[in-house]
Amino acid sequence: MISIKVLFFGEACQLVGKREEAIDFPEETDYEEIRKTILENYPALQKIEKVMMLAVDQEYANPGDRFELVRFTEIAVIPPLSGG
């Protein structure tokens, strides 16, 4: 396991009550495991679960993506984007 900084933006930040948190993940993991771990740690995010996006090291992540996490990896939880 490795402790990774998870950043929360917009509504995700409001739901969890903080901008960032260190969460433990397996060093070799995938999109689904990252999503599951974050939702287990922050059940309030279930409110936006179907529309939230994840980014790993500033690149959007997609279902099926695999990752080898290292000490300085950052994961971002991004709520639905809106605007015009």
UniProtKB/Swiss-Prot annotation:
Annotated organism of origin: Caenorhabditis elegans
PANTHER family to which the protein is assigned, alphabetical: MOLYBDOPTERIN SYNTHASE SULFUR CARRIER SUBUNIT
Function text: Acts as a sulfur carrier required for molybdopterin biosynthesis. Component of the molybdopterin synthase complex that catalyzes the conversion of precursor Z into molybdopterin by mediating the incorporation of 2 sulfur atoms into precursor Z to generate a dithiolene group. In the complex, serves as sulfur donor by being thiocarboxylated (-COSH) at its C-terminus by MOCS3. After interaction with MOCS2B, the sulfur is then transferred to precursor Z to form molybdopterin.
Modified positions (1-thioglycine) in chain numbering: G84
Entry's family note: Belongs to the MoaD family. MOCS2A subfamily.
Modified residues (Glycyl adenylate): G84
One GO BP: Mo-molybdopterin cofactor biosynthetic process
Protein name, UniProt field: Molybdopterin synthase sulfur carrier subunit
The protein's assembly and partners: Heterotetramer; composed of 2 small (MOCS2A) and 2 large (MOCS2B) subunits.
SUPFAM superfamilies: MoaD/ThiS (SSF54285)
Subcellular location: Cytoplasm
Gene: moc-6
Predominant location category: cytoplasm
